[in-house]
Amino acid sequence: MLDTRLKTGVLILEGSNSFATTYYFYYFYFFMQKQFGFGDKANLVLAALNGLVCAFAAWWGGCFAQRAGYFTALKLGFAVMMVALLIGALLDSPEAHIAVMLVTVLGMCFTWPTLEALVSEGETPAGLQHMIGIYNMVWAGTGALAYFIGGAMLDTLGIKSLFYVPAVVFMAQLGFTVWLELEAKKTSQLCQASEIPLARPSDTLSPSDGEREGVTGMSAKPNPRPTTRAKAYLRMAWLTNPFAYIAINTLVAVMPGVAQRLDLSTTLAGFCCSIWCFGRLGAFFGLWFWSGWHYRFRWLLASYLALVATFAVILVVPNLAMLVVAQLVFGGGIGLIYYSSLFYSMDVGETKGEHGGIHEAIIGVGNFTGPAVGAASLQFLPQQAHSGVVAVTALLLCGLGGLLTIWRTTRPPTTKT
C-alpha cells in the first residue's frame, strides 16, 4: 500500500494533469474559432473525434498500465502529450492541429486510468470512499480553475500558451513521476504492476472483489440493501453518466459560439462559462459529507431533469445572468450523476473488472455521440437555428426514458396495507 506521502504525490499529479488537460482541450475550440474560423458545427466534429478516440483508448490505456506498470504508463502518457504540444506550437494548418489534438487525447488516456488506480491502490473500503471524495474534488477543483482563468491566460500570454503552458506542466509531471517511482522503489512499496494487489483503473476506483464483498459505505457489515435493488441503481447510474458526458462534451464544444453570441471576450468567457465546473465541485463536496442521496431515486431523477433543462437553457439563453444560474444548476446535476456512478460501482458487491471497462467505453461513446448528433443536425437542418440544441436535448430525453424504464421494471411492488 502506498503511504500518505506517495499518495499525496499522486494527487499532485492528478491536480496538475486536470489543470493542463482542461486548459488545452477546453480552449482548443476557442483556438480553432479564432485561428481558422471554426463555428459550432466544426467544433462539434472536433469534439466527436475526441470522444471517439477516448472510447477506444481509455480502457486500453488502463490495461497497458496493468501490464507494463503504473509509472511506465504515466511516463509514456506525459511524454506523448508534451511532445505533441511542443510540435503543435510550431504548426499552422487546421489539419495539423487536429492531428496534434488526437495524439494528445491518446496520451491522456494513459494517465487518467493509471492515476485512478494509484489513488485507490491498497485502500481499505472505508479509506477508499474517503479517497474517492478527495480524488473528485482535486480534479474537479483544478479543472474548474483552469477553465476559469484559461481565457485570461490566452489573452495575456498569447495564443501559443495553449501549447506551451500544458507542455511545461507535462514536462514537470514527467520529472515528478520519475522521482515518485524512485521513492516507491526505495521503500519497496511499488516496483512493478505485477507486484501490486490489483490495478483496476477502469473499475472507477472500486476495491477488489474480496475487499468489496459484504462491505457497504464506511461499515464492514453486509450490505443491507436487496441485491437486485442495488444493481438497479448501478445500472441507472451507468446509464445516466454517459448521457451526462453527452451534454458536457457538446456544451464545451459550442461555448465559443455562446461567448460570441453574448459578446464576451475570451477572458470573460472563461470567467462566465466555467461556472458549471464550480457547481459540479460544490456538488462533489456536499455529496462527500452527506449520504442522504444514497439509493434515493428522486435525487438521481431530479439531477437528470436539471441536466436536461439547463443544457438547453445554457445554449439559447439571451443574457448573462440566466447563463450563470443555469450553469450552477447544470453543474450540480452533473456532480450527483457522476458521483452516483462512482458510489454505486463501489457499493454493489459483484461489479467485475470487465464491467469497469464497459463503463469507460460507454462514457467515451457518450463523448462522441452528443457532439456527433449536434454536428449532424446543423449539417442537415441548417435552416433551423437551434437544430443542434433540439437534437441533443431529444437524445438526453431518450436517456430519461431509459432511466424511468429501469426504475419501473426493478422497483419492488407496492404492498397494500
Region roles according to the model:
Residues 3-51, 234-236, 240, 249-258, ...:
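Helix-loop boundary and gating motifs at the non-cytosolic
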Residues 57-69, 154, 283-295, 378:
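Helix-to-loop junctions at the C-terminal end of transmembrane segments
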Residues 73-86, 167, 298-312:
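Structural signature of the two symmetry-related core transmembrane helices
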Residues 104-137:
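Cytoplasmic helix-loop-helix junction between adjacent transmembrane helices
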Residues 110-123, 335-350:
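Intracellular juxtamembrane helix-capping segments at the cytosolic ends
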Residues 155-168, 378-396:
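A membrane-interface helix-boundary motif in multi-pass transporters
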Residues 297-338:
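C-terminal transmembrane helical hairpin of 12-TM major facilitator-type secondary transporters
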Residues 353-380:
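A late C-terminal transmembrane helix in Major Facilitator Superfamily
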